[in-house]
Amino acid sequence: MLKKFPHQLSGGECQRAAIARAISIKPRLLICDEITSALDVQTQAEIIQLLLKLQAETKMSLLFISHDITIVQEICQRILIMQSGTIIESGPALDIITRPQQHYTRELVTAAFNLTKI
């Protein structure tokens, strides 16, 4: 990777380089804004595992911003659901996924976990 030009890097390599750059200053909080959105499923899993490993080793907090609720519910302890820039629901990940209170959240969860209804 060190001998490649930026345009020669894969999406996963670019993400790993961005993560390395971000954690080089030893942040207490790493904001991951759509960090896996342009990656294939295998590379998504590798990036998530890398972040969770780094979190465990450094005790840094991770803030995931994502439209992919299937990934979010797997890795986050708490979820905030936003609609039009406003937080409409928040709570433990399992509660939000299994017992959504807001209509928008129910639609989001249904779309993510029950593709046959689309």
Give short role names for the model-derived ranges.
Residues 72-74:
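A short, surface-exposed alpha-helical micro-motif characterized by mixed small hydrophobic
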